[in-house]
Amino acid sequence: MTACDDAIFKCGTGVRGREGTVSILAGTALVFENLRAKLAPYAGIPLRLIVGYGFLAHGLAKWSRGPEVFAGILQATGVPMAYVMAWITIGTELVAGVAFLAGAFVPLVSIPALILLLVAIFTVHLPYGFSSIKLLSVNEGRAQFGPPGYECDLLYIACIVALVLMGPTRWSVDSYRRRLMS
């Protein structure tokens, strides 16, 4: 056996196994496994950023139009104490959005964020089915869409659960706090 037989890719022959040359795919798998191991601490960053941006954008949109506008929508859908619930929703979306973006207190802010998403699913989105896109018609070349289903809410829930299970990720306040405490 030569040194070339033990090295991956150095001779371009693939990885040598018991029964001869295994494919180049095995070597590629090892390269990707090493890359995955190096990047794993950063895996939560894209989730944090998209969830944080989503919550913050929704909260800012409701707040900029005025809580009374959102309260009117809630009241029309039969939500009790619509004005109070509008403020709770807006506050939760703003605080959770900033917290997710910063990676600060993620397990704590996940609780009200998940409750908010579940309430939205069961009070608003469930009757419209799974899909987030409901094409109603196309008039004069413009698409008309109906109310969204619960697809996006489930995606947010999955991302939040993944963030909580992953724990603090690199470049987050929670990670910084953990390093200070240890």
What residues fall within each predicted segment?
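Extended, low-polarity transmembrane helix blocks
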Residues: 2-65, 83-91, 95-182
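Membrane-interface interhelical connector segments
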Residues: 64-83
